[in-house]
């Protein structure tokens, strides 16, 4: 089977830099797609699977340890951004609030941002963090694509049922929204996710 063009492009992704605040980010130009997810949603694993790189995004035994915005460059005009994870981080409330403020600044003011990929554990969908990101997407009219991660943990029928339930709950979402099943373990949904990333980043899928 021929390699998906986005798989090939993403495999070339290189770590560019980390930033805590908006003014530390790379120049605000080109196109960026950001990846968000609460702790334990499988965000780093999803990024590593989609890029075909085992350790591009750091995975940690302690969820919530990634406290910075991490930028990965595909080329001069295109980047992926790994946003901080939330949920189980063993830090003070004031520190969590500080992270939240920096994330809000990035999401609301970053002109290069063209889409948000939200990782949502299919066994625990629509938690507070997910709802917060959906609300921000609605307010900013920012396209959002949801990966229902860890789909391999459920039988296909149960996974599909959960997907349809979440889809029904979000049908009134005012911003462009799409969702799919995904598994970093067995590769379920990679083609669909690559298609969406290619659309947002302006990389067309070449027909054979």
Swiss-Prot record:
<dbReference type="GO" id="GO:0005829">
    <property type="term" value="C:cytosol"/>
</dbReference>
<dbReference type="InterPro" id="IPR027417">
    <property type="entry name" value="P-loop_NTPase"/>
</dbReference>
<dbReference type="GO" id="GO:0005525">
    <property type="term" value="F:GTP binding"/>
</dbReference>
<feature type="binding site">
    <location>
        <begin position="149"/>
        <end position="152"/>
    </location>
    <ligand>
        <name>GTP</name>
    </ligand>
</feature>
<keyword id="KW-0342">GTP-binding</keyword>
<keyword id="KW-0547">Nucleotide-binding</keyword>
<dbReference type="Pfam" id="PF01926">
    <property type="entry name" value="MMR_HSR1"/>
</dbReference>
<keyword id="KW-0479">Metal-binding</keyword>
<comment type="similarity">
    <text>Belongs to the TRAFAC class TrmE-Era-EngA-EngB-Septin-like GTPase superfamily. EngB GTPase family.</text>
</comment>
<feature type="binding site">
    <location>
        <begin position="182"/>
        <end position="184"/>
    </location>
    <ligand>
        <name>GTP</name>
    </ligand>
</feature>
<feature type="domain" description="EngB-type G">
    <location>
        <begin position="29"/>
        <end position="203"/>
    </location>
</feature>
<feature type="binding site">
    <location>
        <position position="66"/>
    </location>
    <ligand>
        <name>Mg(2+)</name>
    </ligand>
</feature>
<comment type="function">
    <text>Necessary for normal cell division and for the maintenance of normal septation.</text>
</comment>
<dbReference type="InterPro" id="IPR030393">
    <property type="entry name" value="G_ENGB_dom"/>
</dbReference>
<keyword id="KW-0717">Septation</keyword>
<protein>
    <recommendedName>
        <fullName>Probable GTP-binding protein EngB</fullName>
    </recommendedName>
</protein>
<feature type="binding site">
    <location>
        <begin position="64"/>
        <end position="68"/>
    </location>
    <ligand>
        <name>GTP</name>
    </ligand>
</feature>
<dbReference type="GO" id="GO:0000917">
    <property type="term" value="P:division septum assembly"/>
</dbReference>
<keyword id="KW-0132">Cell division</keyword>
<dbReference type="InterPro" id="IPR006073">
    <property type="entry name" value="GTP-bd"/>
</dbReference>
<feature type="binding site">
    <location>
        <begin position="37"/>
        <end position="44"/>
    </location>
    <ligand>
        <name>GTP</name>
    </ligand>
</feature>
<keyword id="KW-0460">Magnesium</keyword>
<keyword id="KW-0131">Cell cycle</keyword>
<dbReference type="InterPro" id="IPR019987">
    <property type="entry name" value="GTP-bd_ribosome_bio_YsxC"/>
</dbReference>
<feature type="binding site">
    <location>
        <begin position="82"/>
        <end position="85"/>
    </location>
    <ligand>
        <name>GTP</name>
    </ligand>
</feature>
<feature type="binding site">
    <location>
        <position position="44"/>
    </location>
    <ligand>
        <name>Mg(2+)</name>
    </ligand>
</feature>
<dbReference type="GO" id="GO:0046872">
    <property type="term" value="F:metal ion binding"/>
</dbReference>
